[in-house]
Protein backbone atom coordinates (compact mmCIF):
# COMPACT_ATOMS: atom_id res chain seq x y z
CA UNK A 1 0.00 0.00 0.00
CA UNK A 2 2.82 2.46 0.89
CA UNK A 3 4.62 1.63 -2.30
CA UNK A 4 1.49 2.31 -4.28
CA UNK A 5 1.08 5.69 -2.58
CA UNK A 6 4.64 6.67 -3.31
CA UNK A 7 4.39 5.69 -6.94
CA UNK A 8 1.06 7.47 -7.42
CA UNK A 9 2.18 10.70 -5.83
CA UNK A 10 0.63 13.61 -7.73
CA UNK A 11 3.84 15.54 -7.57
CA UNK A 12 5.92 12.70 -9.03
CA UNK A 13 8.78 13.16 -6.54
CA UNK A 14 9.50 9.41 -6.21
CA UNK A 15 10.04 9.10 -9.95
CA UNK A 16 12.33 12.08 -9.92
CA UNK A 17 14.37 10.62 -7.03
CA UNK A 18 14.68 7.25 -8.79
CA UNK A 19 15.73 8.85 -12.06
CA UNK A 20 17.86 11.84 -11.08
CA UNK A 21 18.99 10.91 -7.57
CA UNK A 22 18.84 12.96 -4.42
CA UNK A 23 19.66 16.63 -5.06
CA UNK A 24 21.30 15.76 -8.32
CA UNK A 25 24.11 13.67 -6.70
CA UNK A 26 23.27 10.34 -8.38
CA UNK A 27 22.37 8.66 -5.06
CA UNK A 28 19.05 6.93 -5.30
CA UNK A 29 16.69 5.77 -2.56
CA UNK A 30 17.99 2.20 -2.80
CA UNK A 31 21.50 3.43 -2.01
CA UNK A 32 20.20 5.29 1.00
CA UNK A 33 18.34 2.25 2.30
CA UNK A 34 21.44 0.06 1.90
CA UNK A 35 23.57 2.66 3.65
CA UNK A 36 21.09 2.82 6.51
CA UNK A 37 21.18 -0.93 6.99
CA UNK A 38 24.98 -0.91 7.09
CA UNK A 39 25.08 1.89 9.64
CA UNK A 40 22.56 0.07 11.81
CA UNK A 41 24.48 -3.20 11.75
CA UNK A 42 27.81 -1.46 12.38
CA UNK A 43 26.48 0.51 15.32
CA UNK A 44 24.92 -2.59 16.80
CA UNK A 45 28.16 -4.43 16.43
CA UNK A 46 30.22 -1.69 18.06
CA UNK A 47 27.92 -0.86 20.95
CA UNK A 48 26.44 -4.29 21.56
CA UNK A 49 27.82 -6.85 24.02
CA UNK A 50 30.82 -8.61 22.58
CA UNK A 51 33.52 -10.79 23.98
CA UNK A 52 36.32 -9.17 21.91
CA UNK A 53 38.01 -6.51 24.10
CA UNK A 54 39.93 -5.05 21.14
CA UNK A 55 36.71 -4.11 19.43
CA UNK A 56 35.37 -2.16 22.43
CA UNK A 57 38.73 -0.47 22.92
CA UNK A 58 38.83 0.49 19.30
CA UNK A 59 35.37 2.07 19.57
CA UNK A 60 36.35 4.03 22.68
CA UNK A 61 39.52 5.26 21.04
CA UNK A 62 37.56 6.36 18.00
CA UNK A 63 35.11 8.34 20.15
CA UNK A 64 38.01 10.02 21.99
CA UNK A 65 39.53 11.06 18.67
CA UNK A 66 36.21 12.45 17.45
CA UNK A 67 35.78 14.39 20.68
CA UNK A 68 39.27 15.81 20.39
CA UNK A 69 38.59 16.80 16.77
CA UNK A 70 35.32 18.53 17.61
CA UNK A 71 37.02 20.65 20.27
CA UNK A 72 39.18 22.36 17.70
CA UNK A 73 38.12 25.98 16.91
CA UNK A 74 38.18 25.45 13.15
CA UNK A 75 35.83 22.48 13.41
CA UNK A 76 33.44 24.37 15.68
CA UNK A 77 33.31 27.31 13.24
CA UNK A 78 32.42 24.93 10.41
CA UNK A 79 29.65 23.32 12.49
CA UNK A 80 28.20 26.72 13.45
CA UNK A 81 28.31 27.89 9.82
CA UNK A 82 26.52 24.73 8.71
CA UNK A 83 23.84 25.24 11.38
CA UNK A 84 23.14 28.77 10.12
CA UNK A 85 22.89 27.64 6.49
CA UNK A 86 19.32 27.37 5.10
CA UNK A 87 18.15 24.36 3.08
CA UNK A 88 17.89 26.61 0.02
CA UNK A 89 21.60 27.42 0.28
CA UNK A 90 22.37 23.73 0.56
CA UNK A 91 20.38 23.01 -2.61
CA UNK A 92 22.07 25.87 -4.45
CA UNK A 93 25.46 24.60 -3.40
CA UNK A 94 24.66 21.24 -5.00
CA UNK A 95 22.76 22.44 -8.12
CA UNK A 96 23.85 24.80 -10.83
CA UNK A 97 21.79 27.79 -12.01
CA UNK A 98 20.66 26.06 -15.18
CA UNK A 99 19.49 23.01 -13.24
CA UNK A 100 17.51 25.17 -10.81
CA UNK A 101 15.81 27.02 -13.69
CA UNK A 102 14.99 23.74 -15.43
CA UNK A 103 13.43 22.27 -12.28
CA UNK A 104 11.42 25.45 -11.62
CA UNK A 105 9.93 25.27 -15.11
CA UNK A 106 9.33 21.53 -15.34
CA UNK A 107 7.87 20.93 -11.87
CA UNK A 108 5.19 22.99 -10.10
CA UNK A 109 4.00 22.63 -6.51
CA UNK A 110 0.55 21.31 -5.78
CA UNK A 111 -0.66 24.68 -4.42
CA UNK A 112 -0.13 26.36 -7.79
CA UNK A 113 -1.71 23.48 -9.65
CA UNK A 114 -4.87 23.72 -7.54
CA UNK A 115 -5.25 27.45 -8.24
CA UNK A 116 -5.36 27.05 -12.02
CA UNK A 117 -8.78 28.34 -13.24
CA UNK A 118 -11.07 26.16 -15.31
CA UNK A 119 -10.50 26.60 -19.03
CA UNK A 120 -13.91 27.41 -20.51
CA UNK A 121 -12.56 29.27 -23.53
CA UNK A 122 -12.72 27.69 -26.96
CA UNK A 123 -9.28 28.98 -27.87
CA UNK A 124 -5.88 28.74 -26.24
CA UNK A 125 -3.80 31.58 -24.90
CA UNK A 126 -1.37 31.33 -27.79
CA UNK A 127 -4.21 31.44 -30.31
CA UNK A 128 -5.54 34.55 -28.65
CA UNK A 129 -2.11 36.11 -28.85
CA UNK A 130 -1.90 35.30 -32.55
CA UNK A 131 -5.36 36.73 -33.14
CA UNK A 132 -4.36 40.04 -31.60
CA UNK A 133 -1.47 40.49 -34.00
CA UNK A 134 -2.03 42.92 -36.83
CA UNK A 135 -2.17 41.21 -40.23
CA UNK A 136 -1.75 44.44 -42.19
CA UNK A 137 1.61 43.32 -43.59
CA UNK A 138 0.11 40.02 -44.70
CA UNK A 139 -2.74 41.77 -46.49
CA UNK A 140 -0.34 44.15 -48.17
CA UNK A 141 1.97 41.37 -49.39
CA UNK A 142 -1.00 39.23 -50.41
CA UNK A 143 -2.50 42.02 -52.52
CA UNK A 144 0.88 42.76 -54.08
CA UNK A 145 1.43 39.11 -55.04
CA UNK A 146 -2.01 38.73 -56.58
CA UNK A 147 -1.79 42.05 -58.40
CA UNK A 148 1.49 41.02 -59.99
CA UNK A 149 -0.10 37.88 -61.39
CA UNK A 150 -3.15 39.74 -62.81
CA UNK A 151 -1.57 42.93 -64.07
CA UNK A 152 -1.18 41.88 -67.76
CA UNK A 153 -3.25 39.36 -69.70
CA UNK A 154 -0.77 39.19 -72.57
CA UNK A 155 2.88 39.96 -73.02
CA UNK A 156 4.24 42.51 -75.46
CA UNK A 157 4.39 39.94 -78.29
CA UNK A 158 0.68 39.16 -77.90
CA UNK A 159 1.23 35.77 -76.35
CA UNK A 160 -0.60 34.33 -73.37
CA UNK A 161 0.72 35.41 -69.93
CA UNK A 162 1.99 33.06 -67.26
CA UNK A 163 -0.21 30.02 -66.68
CA UNK A 164 -2.39 29.82 -63.55
CA UNK A 165 -0.84 28.98 -60.21
CA UNK A 166 0.11 25.44 -59.56
CA UNK A 167 -1.83 23.10 -57.32
CA UNK A 168 0.69 23.50 -54.51
CA UNK A 169 0.37 27.26 -54.53
CA UNK A 170 -3.42 27.06 -54.50
CA UNK A 171 -3.36 24.68 -51.55
CA UNK A 172 -0.96 26.98 -49.76
CA UNK A 173 -3.25 29.92 -50.45
CA UNK A 174 -6.23 27.95 -49.19
CA UNK A 175 -4.37 27.00 -46.00
CA UNK A 176 -3.50 30.63 -45.41
CA UNK A 177 -7.09 31.72 -45.90
CA UNK A 178 -8.32 28.92 -43.65
CA UNK A 179 -5.86 30.02 -41.00
CA UNK A 180 -7.11 33.57 -41.27
CA UNK A 181 -10.69 32.36 -40.93
CA UNK A 182 -9.73 30.49 -37.77
CA UNK A 183 -8.16 33.67 -36.42
CA UNK A 184 -11.34 35.56 -37.28
CA UNK A 185 -13.31 33.03 -35.25
CA UNK A 186 -10.93 33.46 -32.34
CA UNK A 187 -11.31 37.23 -32.56
CA UNK A 188 -15.09 36.93 -32.59
CA UNK A 189 -14.97 34.76 -29.48
CA UNK A 190 -12.66 37.29 -27.83
CA UNK A 191 -15.07 40.13 -28.63
CA UNK A 192 -18.00 38.12 -27.28
CA UNK A 193 -16.08 37.42 -24.08
CA UNK A 194 -15.25 41.11 -23.69
CA UNK A 195 -18.90 42.06 -24.20
CA UNK A 196 -20.01 39.58 -21.53
CA UNK A 197 -17.33 40.89 -19.19
CA UNK A 198 -18.42 44.49 -19.80
CA UNK A 199 -22.08 43.57 -19.20
CA UNK A 200 -21.16 41.96 -15.90
CA UNK A 201 -19.18 45.02 -14.88
CA UNK A 202 -22.07 47.31 -15.83
CA UNK A 203 -24.47 45.21 -13.76
CA UNK A 204 -22.08 45.37 -10.81
CA UNK A 205 -21.77 49.13 -11.22
CA UNK A 206 -25.56 49.47 -11.29
CA UNK A 207 -25.82 47.52 -8.05
CA UNK A 208 -23.10 49.64 -6.47
CA UNK A 209 -24.84 52.82 -7.69
CA UNK A 210 -28.13 51.74 -6.16
CA UNK A 211 -26.42 51.04 -2.86
CA UNK A 212 -24.82 54.49 -2.87
CA UNK A 213 -28.15 56.11 -3.82
CA UNK A 214 -29.86 54.43 -0.87
CA UNK A 215 -27.07 55.65 1.36
CA UNK A 216 -27.44 59.19 -0.02
CA UNK A 217 -31.19 59.10 0.58
CA UNK A 218 -30.63 58.09 4.19
CA UNK A 219 -28.09 60.87 4.69
CA UNK A 220 -30.46 63.47 3.27
CA UNK A 221 -33.25 62.30 5.56
CA UNK A 222 -30.98 62.55 8.59
CA UNK A 223 -29.80 65.95 7.40
CA UNK A 224 -33.40 67.16 7.05
CA UNK A 225 -34.24 66.06 10.59
CA UNK A 226 -31.13 67.74 12.00
CA UNK A 227 -31.84 70.93 10.08
CA UNK A 228 -35.41 70.89 11.34
CA UNK A 229 -34.15 70.74 14.92
CA UNK A 230 -31.62 73.52 14.26
CA UNK A 231 -34.37 75.75 12.82
CA UNK A 232 -36.51 75.07 15.87
CA UNK A 233 -33.71 76.16 18.17
CA UNK A 234 -33.08 79.28 16.06
CA UNK A 235 -36.77 80.20 16.22
CA UNK A 236 -36.80 79.72 19.99
CA UNK A 237 -33.74 81.93 20.33
CA UNK A 238 -35.39 84.64 18.23
CA UNK A 239 -38.59 84.42 20.25
CA UNK A 240 -36.68 84.65 23.51
CA UNK A 241 -34.76 87.67 22.26
CA UNK A 242 -38.01 89.37 21.21
CA UNK A 243 -39.62 88.59 24.55
CA UNK A 244 -36.67 90.07 26.41
CA UNK A 245 -36.81 93.18 24.23
CA UNK A 246 -40.56 93.48 24.81
CA UNK A 247 -40.16 93.09 28.56
CA UNK A 248 -37.43 95.72 28.59
CA UNK A 249 -39.60 98.11 26.57
CA UNK A 250 -42.57 97.53 28.86
CA UNK A 251 -40.41 98.07 31.92
CA UNK A 252 -39.09 101.30 30.47
CA UNK A 253 -42.60 102.43 29.60
CA UNK A 254 -43.83 101.61 33.11
CA UNK A 255 -40.91 103.49 34.65
CA UNK A 256 -41.55 106.52 32.45
CA UNK A 257 -45.25 106.45 33.30
CA UNK A 258 -44.50 106.20 37.01
CA UNK A 259 -42.06 109.10 36.83
CA UNK A 260 -44.54 111.27 34.95
CA UNK A 261 -47.35 110.38 37.30
CA UNK A 262 -45.18 111.11 40.36
CA UNK A 263 -44.16 114.52 39.10
CA UNK A 264 -47.78 115.55 38.50
CA UNK A 265 -49.32 114.09 41.65
CA UNK A 266 -49.45 117.45 43.43
CA UNK A 267 -51.24 119.09 40.50
CA UNK A 268 -54.15 116.68 39.83
CA UNK A 269 -55.25 113.24 40.97
CA UNK A 270 -54.42 110.15 38.93
CA UNK A 271 -56.96 109.19 36.35
CA UNK A 272 -58.88 106.01 36.81
CA UNK A 273 -58.91 105.35 33.07
CA UNK A 274 -55.93 103.22 31.93
CA UNK A 275 -56.12 104.88 28.53
CA UNK A 276 -55.59 108.27 30.14
CA UNK A 277 -52.56 106.91 31.97
CA UNK A 278 -51.17 105.56 28.70
CA UNK A 279 -51.45 109.01 27.17
CA UNK A 280 -48.57 110.13 29.35
CA UNK A 281 -46.26 107.59 27.72
CA UNK A 282 -43.73 108.77 25.23
CA UNK A 283 -44.51 108.09 21.60
CA UNK A 284 -41.00 106.69 21.16
CA UNK A 285 -41.81 104.08 23.79
CA UNK A 286 -44.98 103.15 21.92
CA UNK A 287 -43.00 102.66 18.75
CA UNK A 288 -40.73 100.18 20.50
CA UNK A 289 -43.60 97.96 21.56
CA UNK A 290 -43.85 94.91 19.27
CA UNK A 291 -46.96 94.17 17.30
CA UNK A 292 -48.89 91.18 18.60
CA UNK A 293 -49.21 89.81 15.06
CA UNK A 294 -46.37 90.58 12.68
CA UNK A 295 -44.95 88.77 9.69
CA UNK A 296 -41.40 87.56 10.27
CA UNK A 297 -39.34 86.89 7.20
CA UNK A 298 -37.02 84.33 8.67
CA UNK A 299 -35.00 83.18 5.73
CA UNK A 300 -34.62 79.43 5.99
CA UNK A 301 -31.39 78.91 4.13
CA UNK A 302 -30.45 75.38 3.41
CA UNK A 303 -26.99 74.54 4.58
CA UNK A 304 -26.75 72.03 1.74
CA UNK A 305 -29.37 71.57 -0.96
CA UNK A 306 -30.72 68.07 -1.71
CA UNK A 307 -28.98 66.41 -4.64
CA UNK A 308 -30.62 62.99 -4.67
CA UNK A 309 -32.99 63.81 -7.54
CA UNK A 310 -30.08 64.94 -9.72
CA UNK A 311 -28.76 61.37 -9.88
CA UNK A 312 -31.98 59.87 -11.27
CA UNK A 313 -32.75 59.61 -14.96
CA UNK A 314 -35.08 62.34 -16.29
CA UNK A 315 -38.69 61.23 -16.01
CA UNK A 316 -38.14 58.99 -12.97
CA UNK A 317 -40.86 58.96 -10.34
CA UNK A 318 -39.74 59.96 -6.85
CA UNK A 319 -42.99 59.91 -4.83
CA UNK A 320 -46.73 59.63 -5.41
CA UNK A 321 -49.45 60.00 -2.80
CA UNK A 322 -53.14 60.78 -2.47
CA UNK A 323 -53.04 64.39 -1.29
CA UNK A 324 -56.73 65.34 -1.66
CA UNK A 325 -60.10 63.86 -2.49
CA UNK A 326 -60.94 66.38 -5.22
CA UNK A 327 -59.32 68.40 -8.01
CA UNK A 328 -56.00 70.01 -7.07
CA UNK A 329 -56.37 73.76 -7.67
CA UNK A 330 -52.96 75.05 -6.56
CA UNK A 331 -49.63 73.80 -5.25
CA UNK A 332 -46.13 75.10 -4.61
CA UNK A 333 -42.86 74.09 -2.92
CA UNK A 334 -39.88 75.96 -1.53
CA UNK A 335 -37.04 73.66 -2.64
CA UNK A 336 -36.57 69.98 -3.67
CA UNK A 337 -37.55 67.54 -0.91
CA UNK A 338 -38.64 70.51 1.20
CA UNK A 339 -42.06 71.85 2.18
CA UNK A 340 -45.00 71.64 -0.24
CA UNK A 341 -48.37 73.39 0.03
CA UNK A 342 -51.39 71.98 -1.80
CA UNK A 343 -54.99 73.16 -2.16
CA UNK A 344 -58.00 71.48 -3.74
CA UNK A 345 -61.74 71.78 -4.22
CA UNK A 346 -62.22 69.78 -1.02
CA UNK A 347 -61.70 73.15 0.78
CA UNK A 348 -58.46 72.09 2.47
CA UNK A 349 -54.96 73.52 2.37
CA UNK A 350 -52.32 71.02 3.42
CA UNK A 351 -48.66 71.30 4.34
CA UNK A 352 -46.41 68.41 3.27
CA UNK A 353 -42.90 67.31 4.10
CA UNK A 354 -41.62 65.97 0.79
CA UNK A 355 -38.66 64.32 2.43
CA UNK A 356 -40.94 61.74 4.03
CA UNK A 357 -44.06 62.24 1.90
CA UNK A 358 -46.41 62.98 4.80
CA UNK A 359 -48.88 65.73 5.61
CA UNK A 360 -47.67 67.75 8.59
CA UNK A 361 -50.76 69.91 9.07
CA UNK A 362 -53.62 72.02 7.69
CA UNK A 363 -53.89 75.76 7.10
CA UNK A 364 -57.44 76.43 8.28
CA UNK A 365 -59.24 79.76 8.07
CA UNK A 366 -60.68 80.22 4.58
CA UNK A 367 -64.42 79.90 4.04
CA UNK A 368 -64.08 78.54 0.48
CA UNK A 369 -61.64 76.74 -1.77
CA UNK A 370 -58.19 78.20 -2.33
CA UNK A 371 -57.49 79.06 -5.99
CA UNK A 372 -53.87 80.24 -5.76
CA UNK A 373 -50.99 80.08 -3.30
CA UNK A 374 -47.25 80.62 -2.95
CA UNK A 375 -44.55 79.67 -0.44
CA UNK A 376 -41.35 81.65 0.01
CA UNK A 377 -38.99 80.65 2.84
CA UNK A 378 -41.34 80.29 5.83
CA UNK A 379 -44.14 82.55 4.52
CA UNK A 380 -47.22 81.18 2.73
CA UNK A 381 -49.83 83.31 0.92
CA UNK A 382 -53.19 81.82 -0.07
CA UNK A 383 -55.94 83.39 -2.19
CA UNK A 384 -59.43 81.98 -1.92
CA UNK A 385 -62.85 82.14 -3.52
CA UNK A 386 -64.01 83.95 -0.36
CA UNK A 387 -62.25 87.09 -1.73
CA UNK A 388 -59.53 87.08 0.93
CA UNK A 389 -55.77 86.64 0.94
CA UNK A 390 -54.28 85.12 4.07
CA UNK A 391 -50.67 85.17 5.20
CA UNK A 392 -49.17 82.30 7.17
CA UNK A 393 -45.85 82.04 9.01
CA UNK A 394 -44.75 78.41 9.18
CA UNK A 395 -41.97 79.26 11.63
CA UNK A 396 -44.66 79.63 14.30
CA UNK A 397 -45.62 75.99 13.99
CA UNK A 398 -45.34 74.11 17.26
CA UNK A 399 -43.52 70.81 17.07
CA UNK A 400 -44.27 68.09 19.61
CA UNK A 401 -41.95 65.13 19.84
CA UNK A 402 -43.49 61.69 20.08
CA UNK A 403 -42.01 59.46 22.74
CA UNK A 404 -44.07 56.39 21.84
CA UNK A 405 -41.96 54.48 19.32
CA UNK A 406 -43.48 51.05 20.03
CA UNK A 407 -44.65 48.83 17.17
CA UNK A 408 -42.69 50.77 14.61
CA UNK A 409 -42.40 47.70 12.38
CA UNK A 410 -46.18 47.43 12.12
CA UNK A 411 -46.45 50.74 10.27
CA UNK A 412 -46.98 50.29 6.55
CA UNK A 413 -44.77 53.25 5.76
CA UNK A 414 -41.13 52.40 6.25
CA UNK A 415 -40.24 56.05 6.76
CA UNK A 416 -41.47 57.81 9.87
CA UNK A 417 -40.58 60.89 11.84
CA UNK A 418 -40.41 61.51 15.57
CA UNK A 419 -42.36 64.75 15.55
CA UNK A 420 -45.79 66.13 14.67
CA UNK A 421 -46.57 69.75 13.81
CA UNK A 422 -49.44 71.98 14.91
CA UNK A 423 -50.21 74.90 12.56
CA UNK A 424 -52.83 76.64 14.70
CA UNK A 425 -50.61 79.66 15.44
CA UNK A 426 -49.29 80.11 11.89
CA UNK A 427 -51.94 82.56 10.70
CA UNK A 428 -50.62 86.15 10.63
CA UNK A 429 -53.39 88.30 9.12
CA UNK A 430 -55.97 88.47 6.34
CA UNK A 431 -56.08 90.86 3.39
CA UNK A 432 -59.75 91.37 2.55
CA UNK A 433 -60.05 94.37 0.23
CA UNK A 434 -61.23 92.40 -2.81
CA UNK A 435 -64.91 91.96 -3.57
CA UNK A 436 -64.49 88.95 -5.85
CA UNK A 437 -62.69 85.64 -5.66
CA UNK A 438 -58.89 85.86 -5.70
CA UNK A 439 -57.61 84.00 -8.75
CA UNK A 440 -53.91 84.94 -8.84
CA UNK A 441 -51.26 86.23 -6.45
CA UNK A 442 -47.51 86.63 -6.16
CA UNK A 443 -45.24 88.14 -3.54
CA UNK A 444 -41.57 89.00 -3.40
CA UNK A 445 -40.02 90.40 -0.27
CA UNK A 446 -42.52 92.74 1.39
CA UNK A 447 -44.59 93.30 -1.77
CA UNK A 448 -47.63 91.20 -2.67
CA UNK A 449 -49.88 91.62 -5.72
CA UNK A 450 -53.22 89.86 -6.02
CA UNK A 451 -55.66 89.61 -8.92
CA UNK A 452 -59.36 89.06 -8.49
CA UNK A 453 -62.57 88.45 -10.39
CA UNK A 454 -63.53 92.03 -9.49
CA UNK A 455 -61.23 93.01 -12.39
CA UNK A 456 -58.68 94.75 -10.18
CA UNK A 457 -55.11 94.20 -9.08
CA UNK A 458 -54.18 95.15 -5.54
CA UNK A 459 -50.72 96.04 -4.29
CA UNK A 460 -50.12 95.08 -0.64
CA UNK A 461 -47.46 96.05 1.88
CA UNK A 462 -46.70 92.94 3.92
CA UNK A 463 -44.98 94.88 6.68
CA UNK A 464 -48.05 96.97 7.50
CA UNK A 465 -50.56 94.44 6.21
CA UNK A 466 -52.61 96.91 4.18
CA UNK A 467 -53.38 97.73 0.54
CA UNK A 468 -51.08 100.34 -0.98
CA UNK A 469 -52.80 100.86 -4.32
CA UNK A 470 -55.49 99.40 -6.56
CA UNK A 471 -54.98 98.88 -10.29
CA UNK A 472 -58.10 98.80 -12.45
CA UNK A 473 -57.45 96.55 -15.44
CA UNK A 474 -60.51 97.73 -17.41
CA UNK A 475 -59.60 101.37 -16.88
CA UNK A 476 -56.02 100.70 -18.01
CA UNK A 477 -57.30 98.90 -21.12
CA UNK A 478 -59.65 101.79 -21.92
CA UNK A 479 -56.86 104.32 -21.49
CA UNK A 480 -54.58 102.31 -23.78
CA UNK A 481 -57.33 102.05 -26.41
CA UNK A 482 -57.95 105.80 -26.35
CA UNK A 483 -54.24 106.43 -26.88
CA UNK A 484 -54.14 104.00 -29.80
CA UNK A 485 -51.84 101.51 -28.14
CA UNK A 486 -54.51 98.80 -28.30
CA UNK A 487 -57.04 98.37 -31.04
CA UNK A 488 -59.79 97.16 -28.72
CA UNK A 489 -60.41 95.18 -25.54
CA UNK A 490 -60.40 91.89 -27.43
CA UNK A 491 -58.02 92.22 -30.38
CA UNK A 492 -58.91 88.77 -31.67
CA UNK A 493 -62.62 89.52 -31.73
CA UNK A 494 -63.33 86.40 -29.65
CA UNK A 495 -65.26 86.37 -26.43
CA UNK A 496 -63.27 84.99 -23.53
CA UNK A 497 -64.24 81.67 -22.05
CA UNK A 498 -66.89 82.09 -19.38
CA UNK A 499 -65.04 79.68 -17.10
CA UNK A 500 -61.73 81.49 -17.54
CA UNK A 501 -60.41 83.72 -14.77
CA UNK A 502 -60.36 87.42 -15.58
CA UNK A 503 -56.89 87.71 -14.04
CA UNK A 504 -55.18 84.45 -14.91
CA UNK A 505 -51.65 85.05 -13.60
CA UNK A 506 -49.47 87.74 -12.02
CA UNK A 507 -45.81 88.06 -11.07
CA UNK A 508 -43.99 90.98 -9.48
CA UNK A 509 -40.37 91.87 -8.92
CA UNK A 510 -39.45 95.12 -7.22
CA UNK A 511 -41.53 97.75 -9.07
CA UNK A 512 -42.25 95.57 -12.13
CA UNK A 513 -45.52 93.67 -12.50
CA UNK A 514 -46.64 91.29 -15.26
CA UNK A 515 -50.32 90.44 -15.55
CA UNK A 516 -52.14 88.05 -17.90
CA UNK A 517 -55.87 88.51 -18.36
CA UNK A 518 -58.83 86.84 -20.04
CA UNK A 519 -58.57 88.98 -23.19
CA UNK A 520 -55.26 87.31 -24.08
CA UNK A 521 -53.21 90.41 -23.27
CA UNK A 522 -50.06 90.44 -21.17
CA UNK A 523 -49.57 93.84 -19.54
CA UNK A 524 -46.39 95.06 -17.89
CA UNK A 525 -47.08 97.54 -15.08
CA UNK A 526 -44.92 100.01 -13.19
CA UNK A 527 -45.98 99.86 -9.55
CA UNK A 528 -44.42 103.23 -8.80
CA UNK A 529 -46.72 105.06 -11.20
CA UNK A 530 -49.55 102.54 -11.40
CA UNK A 531 -49.49 102.71 -15.21
CA UNK A 532 -49.15 100.09 -17.93
CA UNK A 533 -45.65 100.26 -19.33
CA UNK A 534 -46.08 97.82 -22.22
CA UNK A 535 -48.68 95.41 -23.62
CA UNK A 536 -47.81 92.13 -25.33
CA UNK A 537 -50.36 91.06 -27.95
CA UNK A 538 -50.30 87.56 -29.36
CA UNK A 539 -52.53 85.11 -27.53
CA UNK A 540 -56.01 84.49 -28.87
CA UNK A 541 -57.35 83.05 -25.61
CA UNK A 542 -57.25 83.81 -21.88
CA UNK A 543 -53.78 83.82 -20.33
CA UNK A 544 -53.70 81.21 -17.58
CA UNK A 545 -50.06 81.30 -16.44
CA UNK A 546 -46.89 83.35 -16.82
CA UNK A 547 -43.36 83.64 -15.47
CA UNK A 548 -40.44 85.94 -16.29
CA UNK A 549 -36.74 86.24 -15.56
CA UNK A 550 -34.13 88.85 -16.51
CA UNK A 551 -34.50 88.36 -20.28
CA UNK A 552 -37.60 86.35 -21.19
CA UNK A 553 -41.25 86.16 -20.23
CA UNK A 554 -43.08 82.87 -20.83
CA UNK A 555 -46.87 82.77 -21.03
CA UNK A 556 -49.37 79.93 -21.34
CA UNK A 557 -52.91 80.34 -22.59
CA UNK A 558 -56.14 78.49 -23.14
CA UNK A 559 -55.52 78.97 -26.87
CA UNK A 560 -53.29 75.85 -26.52
CA UNK A 561 -50.02 77.72 -27.03
CA UNK A 562 -46.98 78.76 -25.02
CA UNK A 563 -45.18 81.92 -26.08
CA UNK A 564 -41.71 83.10 -25.10
CA UNK A 565 -41.30 86.88 -25.19
CA UNK A 566 -38.10 88.92 -25.31
CA UNK A 567 -38.47 91.61 -22.66
CA UNK A 568 -35.74 93.73 -24.21
CA UNK A 569 -37.46 93.97 -27.60
CA UNK A 570 -41.08 93.39 -26.59
CA UNK A 571 -41.51 90.79 -29.33
CA UNK A 572 -42.04 87.05 -29.54
CA UNK A 573 -38.84 85.05 -29.22
CA UNK A 574 -40.34 81.56 -29.66
CA UNK A 575 -43.72 79.83 -29.58
CA UNK A 576 -45.11 76.30 -29.70
CA UNK A 577 -48.50 74.69 -29.19
CA UNK A 578 -50.27 71.65 -27.81
CA UNK A 579 -53.50 69.82 -28.56
CA UNK A 580 -55.39 71.12 -25.52
CA UNK A 581 -55.50 74.30 -23.41
CA UNK A 582 -52.55 75.09 -21.15
CA UNK A 583 -53.68 75.44 -17.53
CA UNK A 584 -50.34 75.67 -15.71
CA UNK A 585 -46.72 76.33 -16.62
CA UNK A 586 -43.33 76.95 -15.00
CA UNK A 587 -39.69 76.96 -16.11
CA UNK A 588 -36.19 76.81 -14.69
CA UNK A 589 -32.78 77.25 -16.29
CA UNK A 590 -33.08 74.14 -18.47
CA UNK A 591 -36.73 73.23 -19.15
CA UNK A 592 -40.27 74.51 -19.46
CA UNK A 593 -42.99 72.26 -18.03
CA UNK A 594 -46.70 72.66 -18.68
CA UNK A 595 -50.05 71.03 -17.92
CA UNK A 596 -52.00 70.87 -21.18
CA UNK A 597 -55.15 68.87 -20.48
CA UNK A 598 -53.45 65.46 -20.64
CA UNK A 599 -52.41 62.82 -18.12
CA UNK A 600 -48.74 63.72 -18.64
CA UNK A 601 -46.62 66.80 -18.06
CA UNK A 602 -45.34 68.41 -21.24
CA UNK A 603 -41.61 69.16 -21.06
CA UNK A 604 -39.67 71.42 -23.42
CA UNK A 605 -35.86 71.47 -23.35
CA UNK A 606 -34.55 74.97 -23.92
CA UNK A 607 -31.14 73.90 -25.16
CA UNK A 608 -32.06 71.56 -28.03
CA UNK A 609 -35.78 72.31 -28.46
CA UNK A 610 -36.75 68.71 -27.67
CA UNK A 611 -40.32 67.96 -26.51
CA UNK A 612 -41.03 64.95 -24.30
CA UNK A 613 -43.62 63.72 -21.82
CA UNK A 614 -43.17 63.08 -18.12
CA UNK A 615 -45.62 61.54 -15.71
CA UNK A 616 -47.72 58.53 -14.91
CA UNK A 617 -49.49 58.63 -18.26
CA UNK A 618 -46.34 57.80 -20.25
CA UNK A 619 -46.75 54.03 -19.82
CA UNK A 620 -50.44 53.99 -18.93
CA UNK A 621 -51.47 51.99 -22.01
CA UNK A 622 -49.24 49.11 -20.97
CA UNK A 623 -49.54 49.07 -17.19
CA UNK A 624 -53.24 49.58 -16.54
CA UNK A 625 -55.93 52.29 -16.25
CA UNK A 626 -55.18 55.81 -17.37
CA UNK A 627 -54.25 58.27 -14.62
CA UNK A 628 -56.18 61.51 -14.16
CA UNK A 629 -55.49 64.70 -16.10
CA UNK A 630 -52.73 66.94 -14.74
CA UNK A 631 -54.04 70.35 -13.60
CA UNK A 632 -51.08 72.06 -11.88
CA UNK A 633 -47.30 71.79 -12.19
CA UNK A 634 -44.35 73.34 -10.35
CA UNK A 635 -40.63 73.01 -11.07
CA UNK A 636 -37.63 73.81 -8.85
CA UNK A 637 -34.07 72.88 -9.83
CA UNK A 638 -35.09 69.82 -11.84
CA UNK A 639 -37.58 68.67 -9.18
CA UNK A 640 -41.10 68.48 -10.66
CA UNK A 641 -44.39 68.13 -8.80
CA UNK A 642 -47.78 67.75 -10.48
CA UNK A 643 -51.34 67.73 -9.14
CA UNK A 644 -54.16 65.86 -10.87
CA UNK A 645 -57.93 65.99 -11.02
CA UNK A 646 -58.31 62.99 -8.73
CA UNK A 647 -56.29 64.65 -5.94
CA UNK A 648 -53.08 62.69 -6.49
CA UNK A 649 -49.79 64.58 -6.26
CA UNK A 650 -46.57 63.09 -7.63
CA UNK A 651 -42.93 64.16 -7.69
CA UNK A 652 -40.62 63.46 -10.66
CA UNK A 653 -37.12 64.20 -11.84
CA UNK A 654 -37.00 66.50 -14.80
Curated annotation (Swiss-Prot):
Residues 135-165, 249-274 are annotated as: Disordered. One of its GO terms (cellular component) is mitochondrial outer membrane. Its main location: mitochondrion. InterPro entries: G-protein_beta_WD-40_rep, WD40/YVTN_repeat-like_dom_sf, WD40_repeat_CS, WD40_repeat_dom_sf, WD40_rpt. GO terms for biological process: mitochondrial fission; peroxisome fission. It is found in: Mitochondrion outer membrane. The keyword Cell wall biogenesis/degradation does not apply. Residues 209-247 form a coiled coil. It is a peripheral membrane protein. Residues 249-261 have a biased composition (Low complexity). This is Mitochondrial division protein 1. WD repeats lie at residues 323-364, 365-402, 433-472, 478-535, 538-575, 577-614, 623-654. It comes from the Eukaryota. Involved in mitochondrial fission. Acts as an adapter protein required to form mitochondrial fission complexes. Formation of these complexes is required to promote constriction and fission of the mitochondrial compartment at a late step in mitochondrial division. Belongs to the WD repeat MDV1/CAF4 family. Residues 139-151 have a biased composition (Basic residues). Keywords: Coiled coil, Membrane, Mitochondrion, Mitochondrion outer membrane, Repeat, WD repeat.
